[in-house]
């Protein structure tokens, strides 16, 4: 009785990548008092952290004991934009039938599946290809996408993972004279895996299709590919089931004699392409 015991509590910084450590040293004092009537009182004071000072009091004979908490605060974040991280790179083939194609005369964008606004600035065709900006992610962005219904969790092998569906498309406004688009969009997904060391690995999945944009020049009859995208919205925290072949779509003509495809019904693939 009448004694005070003082302790310091500090967190060891192991330097694990992706983690932040709490470097504030907490001081814990325990003061013992005797009221000379047979009751001891222990007053515990915790100080030194950003939460301020917290005091708990316990008297002998009391059944309820309030624990003296010594809180430490840590956080974890990961990104593709760091050594060891991998961003997603989307590259498509661009063809023009009927005349030579000049670099920069066609423009292309990427949008979240079901969205109308381009995710990034439009990119031109160069050398028969379209190279989009790399798609970078971090854990905060993924959390926001999940909350907005644009990403869903697909954890695998004990690692956190997210899947984001996109549509790559050709900007059809301002096409050169005499040019029409036959294959102007395709769907794809990006799977982002948290490696647990502050890095994210983003991988593009084209769902087994060739990433391709096709245009035709000329007034003669041409074949046109009719494509679509199916988006399945799942509630936050739920992983949508595999939708391969689960939805059927039918093409009908509003006018008699209108050109029709050989197959007038089709189903979607795993990435939502129709």
Language-model segments: which ranges?
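Solvent-exposed loop/turn and edge beta-strand elements of beta-rich ligand-binding domains
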Residues: 1-274
């Amino acid at each position: 009785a009448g004694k005070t015991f003082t302790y310091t509590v500090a967190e060891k910084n192991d330097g694990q990548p992706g983690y932040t450590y709490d470097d504030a040293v907490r001081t814990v004092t325990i003061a013992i008092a005797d009221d000379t009537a047979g009751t001891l009182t222990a007053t515990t004071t915790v100080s030194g952290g950003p939460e301020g000072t917290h005091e708990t009091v316990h008297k002998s004979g009391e059944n309820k004991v309030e624990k003296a908490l010594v809180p430490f605060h840590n956080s974890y974040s990961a990104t593709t934009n760091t050594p060891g991280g991998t961003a997603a790179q989307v590259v498509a083939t661009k063809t023009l039938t009927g005349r030579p194609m000049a670099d920069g005369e066609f423009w292309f964008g990427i949008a979240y599946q079901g969205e109308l606004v381009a995710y990034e600035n439009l990119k031109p065709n160069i050398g028969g290809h379209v190279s989009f900006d790399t798609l970078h992610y971090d854990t905060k962005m993924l959390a926001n996408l999940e909350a907005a219904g644009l990403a869903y969790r697909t954890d695998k092998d004990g690692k956190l993972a997210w899947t984001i569906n996109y549509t790559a498309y050709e900007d059809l406004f301002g096409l050169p004279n005499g040019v029409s688009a036959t294959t102007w969009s395709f769907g794809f997904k990006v799977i982002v895996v948290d490696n647990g060391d502050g890095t994210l690995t983003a991988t593009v999945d084209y769902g087994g299709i060739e990433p391709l944009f096709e245009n035709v020049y000329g007034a003669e009859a041409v074949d046109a590919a009719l494509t679509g995208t199916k988006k399945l919205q799942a509630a936050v925290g739920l992983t949508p089931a595999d939708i391969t072949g689960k939805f059927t779509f039918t093409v009908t003509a509003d006018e008699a004699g209108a050109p029709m495809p050989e197959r007038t019904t089709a189903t979607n693939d795993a990435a939502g392409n129709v």
